[in-house]
Amino acid sequence: MKIICLFIPFRKIRHKIKKTFLLKNIQRDKIDSYLPKKTLIQINKYNNEDLIKLNKAIIGGGHKGYFNYDEKSKDPKSPLNPWAFIRVKNEAITLKASLESILPAIQRGVIGYNDCTDGSEEIILEFCKQYPSFIPIKYPYEIQIQNPKSEENKLYSYYNYVASFIPKDEWLIKIDVDHYYDAKKLYKSFYIPRKNYHVISYSRIDFIFNEEKFYVYRNKEGEILKAPGDCLAIQNTNLFWKEILIEDDTFKWNTAKNNIENAKSYEILKVRN
């Protein structure tokens, strides 16, 4: 399919063909079919809340999770044992709860941070002290989205720096710390990849907190579930982040073609051939 697409001159047609033949949507209630039956039975005996509570009492490593019920999860090359790829800047409000929510699913990770002034750094260092399989990585440059002074001040350089601490050919999953994760469903999703080139792209639901109440966000079409985006589980083979210049409205993610001097410098994931 990749070879065929190379000879199709129109980008939109190539994209449509790839989407039709290469992408597979997996419903949440279908994921259990990817797990060995014995493992599934063991995992379903436990819940996220009990494991999170158990892990809060653990100091110095060895936190517990669903990965304890499959020996393959001990393999550092297995998709069942991905590195959490985390970047933080001033997210103290949600940071601790988000990190604790992934522990029953994820055994290790790197936590990059920069320019933190709200106590996020202290939360990260305390978390990594309690769970030393997570590595704190302080980026030594300020990130400047608009008019960056140097390459080191650009977001893509920050991503590449943090990712450099993840061993090559091992799996990673991009974790955002303004998200709260269902660890059981997250861990089960790691059974989806069957080949090293398989990639999982996760959808999500957005919540709005207003006047002491939570609301589920719906788009103009009334849809709750957001389309899968850049929250990926992928093998760290020939990956790198590249600069992409975006117009002011970052929600539309329009690539800047004119007025480059006022564009914002973001990042896009690429794979070296």
Place the predicted regions along the sequence by residue.
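A short acidic, amphipathic alpha-helical/loop segment
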Residues: 97-101, 123, 185-189
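Short beta-strand/loop segment that forms part of the nucleotide-sugar
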Residues: 107-118, 139
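Short beta-strand-to-loop acidic/aromatic patch adjacent to the donor-nucleotide binding site
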Residues: 169-180
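Active-site beta-to-alpha loop of glycosyltransferases that engages the nucleotide-sugar donor
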Residues: 79-100, 115
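Catalytic-site signature of metal-activated, phosphate-bearing donor transferases
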Residues: 3-72, 149-160, 179-273
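Short, well-formed alpha-helical segments that are part of the catalytic scaffolds
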Residues: 63-71, 91-109
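Active-site-proximal specificity loops/subdomain of glycosyltransferases
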Residues: 60-79, 119-171
